[in-house]
From Swiss-Prot:
Pfam families (UniProt xref): DUF1749
GO cellular component: cytosol; nucleus
GO MF terms, alphabetically ordered: hydrolase activity
Record keywords, A-Z: Cytoplasm, Nucleus
The name this protein goes by in its record: UPF0613 protein PB24D3.06c
Highest classification ranks of the organism: Eukaryota, Fungi, Dikarya, Ascomycota, Taphrinomycotina
Source organism of the structure: Schizosaccharomyces pombe (strain 972 / ATCC 24843)
Cellular localization per UniProt: Cytoplasm; Nucleus
InterPro entries: AB_hydrolase_fold (IPR029058), SidJ (IPR013744)
Chief localization: cytoplasm
PANTHER family assigned to the protein according to its UniProt record, in alphabetical order: UPF0613 PROTEIN PB24D3.06C (PTHR31591:SF1)
Keyword Cytoplasm found: yes
Length: 316
């Protein structure tokens, strides 16, 4: 559906932009140094305004003094095929630094929460647990944190996925060709028409690949290296909060997966335990991106949960 959306397009670093959607109050991050920010990053194939619920968050967040900004990274649209979580992290840190200081704000006046959808959830977890760069996020929110590897198993079969992994390792990684783009004929059933490097293919489809954070067959030791490693907020003794919001009817999760049990495993792994938000949960009736095929209550539940979370962060 065609539509126009009022807002401000920020060039947060050379050739990369972020779109600040402006609500009814017309208050912006530039005009108010105390205004807090929900920085949103989508999943594979997403770009500006491609996740349907983002626009629905603008006015509810505006009413409690928050702005929502959707960030474009080098991995947006089809860029993910030759990208990595490390490159995404560098882009996201540049965006956080930009918005932390725009309009004369600083760390003491502006609070920032990073929210990721789908593979954007990997960006959130990487930022909070593995990044070597400073952490100025008071919280991370992962919506539809799903396993890309298990999604590949679901749609292409476990054996075919393993065959692809073995072939890529033998023909590319073992020969030092990890940055080379794979032949379309070999990967189109997995990645469509997106040019995909050997490294990114392995990141997404191999057991314990660099993107393999949310698979149900990972061990407690695996989760301890990610969920169990939340970093302190820079300049503080406090740690960032982590909120996990799974979709009840997520089409990219196998019907045989017990989402409630998996969510509990994630949460039980979070360290320090003070970072384990009680607001994590399963969005009732929600599809992967809480889109039109979701139940009517899904979007309302998501908005209410986010409002509750963001209000609680103001007092921290």
């Amino acid at each position: 559906m065609s539509a126009s959306h009022p807002g401000i397009l920020h060039e947060y670093t050379e050739r990369l932009v972020a779109f600040e959607l402006v609500g009814k109050s017309n208050v912006t991050l530039t005009s108010n140094v105390t205004r807090s920010l929900l920085l949103f990053v989508g999943g594979l194939g997403d770009g500006l305004l491609t996740v349907p619920y983002v626009q629905e968050l603008v006015n509810p967040l505006d009413e409690i003094g928050w702005s929502i900004v959707q960030v474009q990274t080098q991995s947006s649209y089809i860029g993910w095929g030759t990208g990595s979580l490390k490159r995404d992290d560098e882009d996201l840190h540049k965006a956080v630094d930009y918005f932390l200081h725009i309009g004369g704000a600083d760390f003491s006046t502006r609070k920032i929460v990073l929210m990721g959808h789908s593979t954007g959830s990997q960006n959130v977890l990487y930022y909070l647990t593995q990044s070597i760069l400073p952490n100025y996020l008071i919280a991370g929110i992962a919506q539809a944190p799903v396993s890309d590897r298990e999604a590949a198993y679901q749609f292409n079969g476990k054996e075919k996925t393993k065959e692809l992994v073995d072939w890529v390792k033998a023909e590319y990684l073992d020969k030092g060709l990890g940055n080379d783009v794979l032949p379309r004929s070999k990967v189109e059933n997995f990645f469509g028409e997106v040019p995909t490097s050997a490294n990114r293919c392995i990141d997404l489809t191999d057991v314990r690949g660099n993107d393999d954070f949310f698979s149900s067959d990972l061990s407690a030791d695996d989760f301890a290296k990610t969920f169990g490693n939340l970093k302190e907020i820079s300049g503080s003794t406090a740690h960032s909060q982590l909120i996990l919001l799974m979709s009840e009817r997520d089409e990219f999760v196998s019907p045989s997966t017990d989402k409630a049990q998996l969510l509990n495993r994630f949460r039980e792994s979070i360290r320090p335990t003070t970072s384990n938000s009680s607001l994590s949960g399963i969005i009732p009736g929600a599809t992967h991106n809480v889109g039109p095929k979701s139940s009517p209550e899904a979007l309302k539940w998501l908005i209410n949960q986010l409002i509750t979370a963001l209000r609680s962060f103001i007092d921290q």
